Design a protein with these regions (language model features):
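Bacterial N-terminal signal peptides that target proteins for export
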Residues: 1-12
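Leucine-biased recognition of intrinsically disordered, low-complexity hydrophobic segments
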Residues: 4-5, 17, 114
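Bacterial N-terminal signal peptides
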Residues: 11-21
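Short hydrophobic/aromatic patches on the structural cores and recognition surfaces of FHA
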Residues: 14, 114, 394
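Intrinsically disordered, low-complexity terminal regions enriched in Ser/Thr/Pro/Gly
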Residues: 23-282, 293-323
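Residues within mature, well-folded domains
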Residues: 252-254, 266, 279-280, 303-461
Length: 461
């Protein structure tokens, strides 16, 4: 029986296969995601503290720098009691790669190297070379999750060191993460670690691998995804086995409980733990699963956000993004919400600010976060995210100006240059003055006052 978590269409299929403990060149998986799956990340553009440290803290694979990537290590039972099937998943952006023209399209190549060691002994070395091809230059500049890599490894239970290296073959970008890992033994009456997936077809034999497309970032995009899904397997269980599930928010408060029946097929049982996004709220959550009446449990992170790479690591961080969307008083009311009421209060806020309740999306919030992403690209200054600059905050609040132009002083030099934005709808004319000569325009005092007055009026409506 196929279990499919339907989120959105995929433009390109797998360019390879996945296999257990494979040799380097043939049995590996990569996938290029289709266009239009959320805005570029404000995090990637400096819109919030780099979340890679937080990801590593909760056991994920993550690096920032010139070649940022995010991923996870998940475990399923192997073909024997002395083997565990370990799944390494990675996600990174097209923009990290160097593309060259190829018959009207764009092509890039990358290498992923996995080294598993115990002391001075190399237990597994896998070097995978992949190529991707996109249709246009525009796609090469994407900063959202564009490439998904996944690799299954068969390893004996025990303690290891894992090195994950990703390199752009066409340029100098590269990054590496080293981490200590403990591979569990998954015997009878145990569960696999849950795997966040875009789609999955469960396996029926332990000597095979499930046909799945992993979600390395475990990100659920509000307005796009209606369900948050995790694939889990059970071993040596009866046909009536069930899994108890609890979802905890970032304050460690249980916000959802459920019981899911495992489906027995062949040698093993499996289930898709899926939850309505509206019942969870927004921000990071932890999903804990255990066999009914058992004391041991497994867990996995999920991040409910507004884009694949938004990197929102707490409810408070989400609220910091809303400073130009609603009044400070309204943000504070959300901030003061007790942790066990956040999901309900956020659902009410979503409904109140949704201009078109007949759709699954909140178009106002969707467009607002898209403007944050655009502002980070256009208006970023050294040490300051684009959406927090003067031009950025105006753009995020009001959108594209109806007219925009530049005006120079009598000396026609960059110093004293003025940039003028006009918003006809609001009868507003804003002047940004660049006194530094290094493209850091600031609102004039009168324009700042006019803008603040308009913002107060809009936020009071």
């Amino acid at each position: 029986m196929a279990v499919l978590l339907r989120r959105h269409a995929w433009a390109v299929g797998f360019s390879g296969l996945v296999a257990i403990g494979c040799s380097p060149s043939t049995h590996n998986g990569g996938r290029v995601r289709g266009e239009g799956h959320g805005p570029p990340s404000p995090v990637a553009n400096g819109g919030a503290p780099d979340p890679s440290g937080f990801y590593r803290q909760i056991g994920m694979i993550a690096q920032s720098g010139s070649f940022p990537f995010v991923g996870q290590l998940r475990y399923l039972a192997g073909s024997s009691a002395d083997s565990t099937l370990s799944l390494v998943t990675l996600s990174f952006a097209n923009r990290s790669l160097t593309f060259t023209g190829d018959a009207g399209a764009q092509r890039a190549a990358y290498t992923v190297t996995l080294d598993v060691t115990q002391g001075t002994t190399t237990v597994r070395h896998v070097e995978t070379h992949k190529q991707i091809r996109v249709a246009s230059f525009h796609e090469t500049q994407r900063e959202d999750e564009s490439v998904i890599f996944q690799q299954f490894l068969s390893l004996a239970p025990g303690a290891y060191s894992l090195s994950v290296s990703v390199r752009d073959d066409g340029g100098g970008n590269a990054n590496v993460q080293q981490m200590s890992v403990t591979i569990p033994r998954l015997g009878p009456h145990t569960l696999s670690t849950p795997i966040s997936v875009y789609q999955v077809k469960p396996r029926v034999r332990l000597d095979t691998v499930p046909a799945l497309i992993a979600n390395p970032r475990s990100t659920i995009v509000l307005g796009r995804d209606t369900l948050a899904g995790l694939y889990v397997e059970g071993y040596g269980l009866s046909t009536s086995a069930r899994v108890d599930v609890a979802v905890l928010n970032d304050a460690h408060v249980v916000i959802l409980r459920d019981t899911v029946n495992l489906v027995r097929q062949g040698d093993l049982s499996s289930a898709l733990l899926d939850f309505p996004v509206a019942s969870i709220g927004v921000g990071p959550v932890t999903v804990i699963a255990s066999l009914a009446s058992a004391t041991d449990s497994v867990q996995a992170p999920l991040f409910l956000s507004f884009g694949d790479e938004f990197g929102i690591t707490s409810f408070d961080e989400l609220l910091s993004y809303l400073r130009y969307f609603v009044s400070p008083q309204r943000v504070q009311l959300l901030r003061d919400t007790p942790p066990d009421q956040r999901a309900a209060v956020w659902a009410a806020f979503w409904k109140q600010t949704d201009p078109n309740p007949s759709t699954l999306e909140n178009e106002a919030l969707r467009d607002y976060f898209k403007r944050i992403a655009t502002a980070n690209t256009r208006y970023r200054e050294e040490g300051l995210a684009g959406w927090l600059t003067d031009r950025g905050k105006v753009y995020v609040t009001l959108g594209e100006p109806d007219q925009a132009g530049q005006q120079f002083g009598t000396n026609t030099t960059a110093r004293g240059r003025a940039e003028i934005w006009v918003y006809t709808q609001y009868n507003l004319r804003l002047i940004f003055i660049n006194q530094s000569g290094i493209a850091h325009p600031r609102l004039s005092s009168s324009s700042q006052a006019d803008f603040d007055k308009l913002v107060r009026r809009l936020q009071s409506q």
